[in-house]
Amino acid sequence: LLVLRYQIKKICKTIMKKNNPNLSDEQKLILFDEGTEPPGSSELNNEKREGSYHCANCGVKLFDSKTKYESGSGWPSFYESLPDVFETKTDHLIGYARTEYHCKNCDAHHGHIFEDGPQPTGKRYCNNGICLVFKLKI
């Protein structure tokens, strides 16, 4: 059953990658090929308004603006996500283990979780800004 679930997710991911007309080539590279945008390149680094952050691919709400903070990393950072919106896996791409997180709804890659964030969680969700859509609270 787990193998079947994995295969279905993989097929859906491939379909979304090829057919989502709302995504740029750069977004597709990061969301589906686990790329990384250059640090400091996202306008969301400077976003201070109240609102929420959503997956650029499927629109699921991932973060509340109240959990965003300036980490100094060059990427939009949050100390907490909304409950049950991400799945994680271990990434060894750069020579050591990191925890990578993906949207649970569409399997799109967003970034990595580090254990150097502020309280109350001590976590830093280091997110590629290009993978997020900010929605202003009305």
Enumerate the language-model features and the residues they cover.
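A short Gly-Trp-Pro
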Residues: I15-I138
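N-terminal amphipathic/basic-hydrophobic helices that include classical n-h-c signal peptides
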Residues: L1-I15
